């Protein structure tokens, strides 16, 4: 009951209550949106940061040409055994430089003839290259080359099994010999950007074992 001298404020109170509830809902909605946007920005920032770090890390690994952390040159068989036993070592790959290629007919490449074992190839080298076609050499007369070397040889469309003639020397000999090899594989590598066009001609274990020269001081342990 409302007396004559009283004002009926019930409708006003209801309107104020509804308006207050509406504003409260808006504030809650804005708060939720702000939280969602904040969470999104934080997640996006971390994602971009991690992606940048991973990209940078991959670029550095590719420029180095191996995932190994350190290389120890001129190691002996006994030293290799002791290194492999260490709890601090994840794996050990073997690299052996056998000789070099006569690159006088090429533009500016400097190529070493190199053999690496399965660990070095699969765990240290493969992660740093791309566009791999074919396989690592297995026969005595097989080689594997990076595409930039093939291009300097005038080969723009390499084919597995194609013949490639190389003039090369082995060990400390200054006598160059010429042989015809078969291309077992090719790939894209990135170390020439760091090494001023130094590269590798990968050869097989069979080729290495066929050499009648001492290569005792040419073994490098690649440690990760």
Residue ranges of model-derived segments:
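Feature of multi-pass inner-membrane transport and sensor proteins
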Residues: 1-30
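Alpha-helical transmembrane segments
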Residues: 23-32, 37-65
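Short, mixed-charge, low-aromatic patches
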Residues: 4-15, 35-41, 102-107
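Basic-flanked hydrophobic alpha-helices used for secretion and membrane insertion
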Residues: 50-224
């Amino acid at each position: 009951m409302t007396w004559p001298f009283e004002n009926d404020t019930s409708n006003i109170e209801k309107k104020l209550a509804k308006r207050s509830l509406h504003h409260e809902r808006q504030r809650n909605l804005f708060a939720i949106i702000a939280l969602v946007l904040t969470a999104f920005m934080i997640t996006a920032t971390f994602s971009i940061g991690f992606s940048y770090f991973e990209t940078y890390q991959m670029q550095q690994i590719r420029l180095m040409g191996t995932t190994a952390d350190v290389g120890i040159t001129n190691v002996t068989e006994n030293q290799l055994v002791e290194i492999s036993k260490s709890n601090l070592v994840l794996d050990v790959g073997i690299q052996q430089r056998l000789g070099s290629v006569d690159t006088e007919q090429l533009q500016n490449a400097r190529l070493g003839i190199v053999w690496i074992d399965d660990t070095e190839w699969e765990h240290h080298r493969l992660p740093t290259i791309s566009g791999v076609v074919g396989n690592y050499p297995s026969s005595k007369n097989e080689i594997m080359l990076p595409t930039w070397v093939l291009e300097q040889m005038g080969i723009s469309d390499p084919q597995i099994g194609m013949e490639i003639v190389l003039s090369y020397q082995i060990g400390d000999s200054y006598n160059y010999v010429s042989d015809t090899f078969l291309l077992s594989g090719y790939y894209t590598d990135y170390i020439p950007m760091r090494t001023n066009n130094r590269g590798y001609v990968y050869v097989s274990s069979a080729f290495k074992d066929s050499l009648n020269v001492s290569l005792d001081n040419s073994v490098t342990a690649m440690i990760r």
